[in-house]
Swiss-Prot record:
This is Anaerobic regulatory protein. It is found in: Cytoplasm. Residues 223-235 are annotated as: Essential for the oxygen-regulated activity. It comes from Bacillus subtilis (strain 168). Residues 145-219 form the HTH crp-type domain. GO terms for cellular component: cytosol. The cysteine cluster which is probably involved in the coordination of the [4Fe-4S] cluster is located at the C-terminal part of the protein. SUPFAM superfamilies: cAMP-binding domain-like (SSF51206), Winged helix' DNA-binding domain (SSF46785). Its cofactor is [4Fe-4S] cluster. Homodimer.
């Protein structure tokens, strides 16, 4: 996957004071493609601030399918949902998609620092709440509208995060295989193939010569999933 992001990173959504605190109490660690920073169910002792590379955040569904919830890159933070919880365990898995480096932040050390600064604690908890809303909205689309709803909402989120306006619609400026899209929907690749084929026949999307999707009728997708018009900070692919 080749991600050419235009969305804000987590460092754009938190203050410089909080970001500097995270950097000051961290240590560097290399990460290799196809390894995991953590897996769902493991004891949660660390948070990670990405310096380079790509990380996929997801989980296994009850029927054994991969469900991708986030794709994280430079300056994003992962593992944050375990803060201020007793006997914390990671709720999701973090798979390395591209070699890189992370800053490792000890959970207990961060909690001690935040307790001494109420303003930064409030900011961090507010930021965590935003991430929870993102995950909840993605799961909502899957539960209420099935695989089709998950695919349609994924295309909308991709257009918000990586979209480039054109005269004929919105170019989603990343290259994704149908298998990549299937993981965002916890669906089989064959199902995604059929759904994308239907959208092409209806003129909702097309594929350019480089394999990128052009979204011609985003309002059609919004109508189909009864879009709630969430703000862009919620309706994106991270």
């Amino acid at each position: 996957m080749n991600f050419l992001s235009v969305r804000p990173s987590d460092s754009d959504l938190i203050s410089s004071d909080l970001y500097e605190l995270l950097e000051s109490i961290s240590t560097k660690r290399k990460m290799e493609k196809h390894t995991y920073l953590f897996r769902e169910g493991m004891d949660a002792e660390e948070l990670y601030l990405i310096q380079s590379g790509l990380i996929e955040i997801g989980k296994l569904t009850s029927d054994g399918k991969d469900l991708t919830l986030r794709i994280c890159q430079k300056h994003d933070i992962v593992g944050e949902l375990t803060l201020f919880t007793e006997e914390p365990r990671y709720m999701l898995s973090a798979k390395v998609l591209e070699d890189g480096e992370v800053l490792v932040i000890n959970k207990n050390k961060l909690e001690k620092e935040l307790i001494q600064n109420g303003a930064l604690t409030f900011e961090f908890m507010k930021w965590m709440s935003t991430h929870l809303r993102k995950i909840q909205s993605k799961i909502r689309d899957l539960l209420l509208h099935g695989k089709k709803g998950a695919l349609y909402s994924t295309l909308i989120r991709l257009s918000n995060s990586y979209g480039v306006e054109r005269s004929d619609g919105i170019l989603i400026n990343i290259v994704l295989t149908n298998q990549d899209l299937a993981k965002f929907c916890a669906a089989a690749r064959e199902s995604v193939n059929r759904m994308l084929g239907d959208l092409r026949k209806k003129g909702v999307i097309s594929i350019d010569e480089s394999g990128k999707i052009i979204l011609h009728k985003r309002d059609y997708l919004r109508c189909e999933i009864e879009c709630e018009n969430c703000p862009l900070e919620i309706c994106n692919i991270d």
